[in-house]
A protein has these predicted regions:
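Extracellular ligand-binding/catalytic regions of CAZymes and related secreted enzymes
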Residues: 3-75, 250-264, 268-377
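Loop/turn elements at helix/coil->beta-strand transitions in domains of secreted/extracellular proteins
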Residues: 38-40, 102-106, 146-152, 311
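Short loop/turn segments at strand-loop or loop-helix junctions that form parts
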Residues: 43-45, 104-121, 154-156, 315-323
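Generic extreme N-terminal start-of-chain segments
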Residues: 19-50, 54-76, 90-93, 179-240, ...
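Signal peptide-directed secreted proteins
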Residues: 82, 86-96, 100, 195-292, ...
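Post-signal peptide N-terminal segment of secreted/secretory-pathway proteins
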Residues: 67-142
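A glycine-rich, often tryptophan-bearing local segment used as a flexible ligand/cofactor-contacting loop or short
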Residues: 120-128, 132-248, 252-253
Length: 377
């Protein structure tokens, strides 16, 4: 008996049609939407030998949201060269700030990707660019901020502040101070991959004994070499660190979920608790809390801060904007929302924090910046 394949063929054609329409319509929608004009200056002051730039995720989002420079030029990331290029020599990526920051809506202080102990070597060989923000840079940033330019700073950018004078200039803009400490969840404190040799040496030098820790914990390191370990089951009930938005932060961002965070974060001290939009939740025991007090470490770990006093600024204390692959889907309308929905809230998922935290947070920041009209003389 001859089999009839017509129903199967029709079903396959119907599926292909639905898929094609589902991809083509959002692409046409993206192509037809009017671009958003924003001039964004990305300041990359990391050492030239640092890992790939952390602003790749920002550039993907700018492209996906169809945000372009006011000249009409779009932001383009060249993945092959691992650097950011803009068309026709109109680059807004800079290591040296101009004498006057004009025609700018947003200054973005970028930090480079790092999976190890946060450290930036600010010493350079003769003839090389000086890594780190100088007093000159800080003065120009503060001058621009006083004229209404918003400032966004990423995790680890404070390690690029080369002097106390730089800190003094940027402190009123960001509305926070650095404690000098950084923290990270460690799943195996005996692992030489997760706990570097430098951390072990610093601990042994100060404590006068071999590295004694095992199991899970939270590692805290100071820029001067100090090391504190919060042991899972003793200093913290569980070693997990969860990012949780405050009530103000939930209203601001629309994010209701909590997310387990496993990368490095800055421990900062805000001028006002009202500036905290999200914080890291830890299950500190009384013993762990006392250990932090003895070390002079704040027990509250802010994650995202927004300063809207005399200056408009935002600080992300974690590396949320890291993007592993620069996706083609940036030209699909709504792809950012789809990825936020379909990406599981699991720490093992690559780019989870990018889609579920960084993208919605940066979209809200860009929306606020867009609402502010700058008229330059």
């Amino acid at each position: 008996m001859k089999r009839n394949h017509r129903p199967l063929t029709l079903w396959l054609l119907a599926c292909l049609t639905v898929i094609s329409v589902g991809l083509v319509v959002p692409w046409i929608w993206w192509q037809s939407q009017a671009p958003v004009l924003l001039n964004i200056m990305i300041i990359d002051k990391t050492n030239a030998n640092a890992p790939y730039p952390g602003y790749k995720g920002l550039v993907w989002l700018l492209n996906q949201q169809k945000i372009v420079q006011k000249t009409g030029e779009r932001y383009v990331y060249d993945e092959n060269e691992e650097e950011l290029n803009l068309l026709e020599n109109t680059s807004t990526i800079t290591k040296k700030l101009p004498d006057e920051v004009t025609e700018t809506d947003l200054i973005y202080l970028a930090s480079s990707k790092t999976n190890t102990v946060p450290a930036v070597n600010l010493k350079t060989k003769k003839g090389e660019e000086i890594a780190g923000l100088t007093v000159y840079d800080a003065l120009k940033i503060r001058e621009a901020a006083s004229r209404g330019v918003a400032v966004v700073a990423e995790y680890n950018t404070q390690s690029l502040w080369t002097s106390d004078n730089v800190r003094d200039q940027l402190h009123p803009i960001l509305g926070l101070k650095s404690s000098g400490w950084r923290g990270k969840y460690i799943s195996n404190l005996q692992s030489r991959v997760q706990v570097s040799e430098q951390v072990r040496m610093d601990y042994e030098r100060i404590a006068g004994q071999a590295w004694p820790y095992s199991g899970k914990g939270i590692l805290l390191v100071h820029e001067d070499g100090g090391v504190i370990v919060l042991r899972g089951g003793k200093d913290v009930q569980t070693a997990e660190i969860k990012l949780s938005f405050t009530e103000k932060g939930r209203q601001w961002s629309g994010i209701q979920q909590e997310f387990q965070y496993t990368s490095w974060f800055d421990v900062v001290v805000p001028d006002s608790p009202e500036s905290i939009l999200a914080r890291y939740k830890t299950s500190l025991t009384q013993e762990g809390r006392q250990k932090l007090i003895n070390a002079g470490i704040p027990g509250d770990f802010p994650a995202i801060l927004r300063n809207d006093g005399d200056y408009q600024s935002y600080y992300m204390t974690g590396s949320y904007g890291e993007m592993e692959h620069y996706s083609f889907w940036r030209r699909i309308k709504g792809w950012d929302i789809i990825r936020e929905w379909i990406t599981p809230n699991l720490k093992e998922i690559p780019d989870m924090f990018y889609w579920k935290v960084y993208v919605p947070v940066m979209k809200q920041i860009l929306k606020e910046v867009q609402a502010e009209e700058h008229v330059w003389p």
